[in-house]
Amino acid sequence: MAMKLRLTRMGCKKRPFYRIVAMNSETRRDGRALEYLGYYNPMVDPAEIKVDGDKVRAWLARGAEPTDTVRALLQKAGV
């Protein structure tokens, strides 16, 4: 079972925000997440990124692979 750190879309039509979550790579995009790690809100200026660094490091230590987008967001957040 390959674990991924990825984004799930939340919010209403034309007003998205995203949760950064840990989930199985085979789970659908908005499926049940194993753990919520933070969020990303691109609708405010500047874009808001909040991440729990300890939880992210724990999942990376367990072998979870972040998607390219999540990797870029984590670098911006300084994790």
UniProtKB/Swiss-Prot annotation:
Recorded name of the encoding gene: rpsP
GO cellular component: cytoplasm; small ribosomal subunit
Coiled-coil ranges from the UniProt annotation: none
Domain of life where this protein originates: Bacteria
One Pfam family named in its UniProt record: Ribosomal_S16
Record GO terms (molecular function): structural constituent of ribosome
Family annotation (SUPFAM superfamilies): Ribosomal protein S16
InterPro entries xref list: Ribosomal_bS16 (IPR000307), Ribosomal_bS16_dom_sf (IPR023803)
Species, as recorded: Solidesulfovibrio magneticus (strain ATCC 700980 / DSM 13731 / RS-1) (Desulfovibrio magneticus)
Gene Ontology biological-process annotations: translation
Identification of the protein by name: Small ribosomal subunit protein bS16
NAD is among the record's keywords: no
Keywords: Ribonucleoprotein, Ribosomal protein
UniProt keyword Electron transport, yes or no: no
Stretch forming the signal peptide: none
Similarity section: Belongs to the bacterial ribosomal protein bS16 family.
HAMAP family: Ribosomal_bS16
